[in-house]
């Protein structure tokens, strides 16, 4: 079983490192194009997106793995049970994301004033970011389904598609001189939006014509399991990204410029975060599918030991 975990970690890991490294090449690219204050807008927005994604996915990713395993344990028509689970979790997250976007788009002017002077002249930034979040949430459960099915290569291929498209568009916009126009940094969000939308359209081909449809009885059970995960996820995400907001609101002068510098420097820690990410992508469905096996405790202990050893080596 540990061999399977190691294999999936390697698949997720090599591809994740390559894709994320390509994505992080945008950091020196953007810092050469934009001034410190302008790049501060990028840092600010991309610190808020993970919080919105955590809130709107509601812990349903992990719940999907858990209840998929329960469907297999229960026997019967496992395929129908998993299809019902997928339709329910996908449906509720899609609905939540749609409502979120409508609210954000409707109140974009008020939100732009709340976020600071840098956004007042460009409330459209809020709309573009809302659309990015919408498409990313709509893609979330289909991606979880691929992980649950062990289709690691397809998973990383689709993730790579989005990142590569984002990078290519960003470079193309820069070469075309669009970042120097009045819309400026907004083209960063447009590139991301196009990449997220294309990824969502492509991943739709993997859902086997399943229509998002909420089974309310099943949702109650799933949400009871996911609620603690949601709370923990929000706490973890806030802990990881709240420092950006503290800089934005507590630095007396030049806060956005300082935020831009800080955001660029924190990219240095990317290697450790990449290793954590690649292990989590493989470990989460693996453990939630095997936790009832007799040797699970020993297997978990061994996996954690090697994870800590590898983490110390990277450090």
Can you annotate each of these PLM segments?
Residues 4-65, 97, 101-105, 132, ...:
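Signature of the first transmembrane helix
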Residues 127, 156-208, 232, 266-269:
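Hydrophobic alpha-helical transmembrane segments
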Residues 1-24, 80-83, 87, 153, ...:
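N-terminal membrane topogenesis motif
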Residues 17, 87-115, 168-172, 276, ...:
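Alpha-helical transmembrane segments of multi-pass membrane transport and lipid-handling proteins
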Residues 1-5, 181, 185-188, 201-240, ...:
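Interhelical loop/hinge segments that connect adjacent transmembrane helices in multipass membrane
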Residues 6-19, 83-84, 126-131, 145-171, ...:
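Alpha-helical transmembrane segments of multi-pass membrane transporters/permeases
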């Amino acid at each position: 079983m540990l061999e399977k975990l190691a294999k999936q970690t390697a698949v997720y890991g090599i591809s994740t490192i390559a894709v994320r490294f390509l994505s992080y090449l945008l950091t020196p690219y953007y810092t050469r194009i934009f001034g410190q204050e302008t790049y501060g807008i990028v840092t600010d927005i991309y610190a808020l997106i993970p919080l919105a994604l955590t809130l709107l996915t509601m812990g349903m990713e992990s719940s999907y793995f858990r209840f998929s395993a329960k469907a297999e344990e229960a026997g019967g028509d496992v395929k129908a049970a998993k299809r019902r689970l997928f339709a329910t979790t996908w449906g509720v997250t899609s609905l939540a994301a749609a409502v979120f976007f409508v609210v954000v788009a409707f109140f974009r002017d008020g939100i732009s004033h709340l976020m600071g002077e840098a956004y007042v002249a460009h409330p459209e930034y809020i709309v573009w970011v809302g659309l990015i979040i919408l498409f990313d949430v709509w893609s979330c459960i289909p991606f979880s389904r691929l992980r649950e099915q062990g289709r690691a290569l397809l998973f990383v291929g689709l993730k790579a598609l989005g990142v590569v498209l984002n990078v290519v568009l960003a470079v193309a916009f820069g070469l075309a001189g669009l970042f120097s126009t009045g819309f400026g940094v907004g083209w960063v969000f447009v590139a991301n939006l196009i990449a997220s939308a294309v990824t969502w359209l492509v991943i739709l081909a993997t859902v086997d014509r399943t229509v998002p449809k909420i089974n309310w009885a099943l949702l109650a059970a799933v949400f009871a399991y996911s609620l603690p995960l949601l709370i923990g996820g929000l706490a973890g995400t806030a802990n990881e990204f709240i420092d950006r907001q503290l800089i934005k609101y507590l630095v007396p002068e030049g806060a956005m410029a300082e935020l831009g510098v800080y955001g660029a420097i924190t990219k240095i820690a990317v290697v450790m975060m990449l290793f954590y990410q690649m292990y989590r992508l493989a470990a989460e469905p693996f453990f939630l599918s095997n936790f009832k096996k007799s040797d699970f405790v020993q297997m978990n202990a061994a996996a954690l030991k090697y994870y800590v050893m590898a983490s110390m080596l990277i450090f």
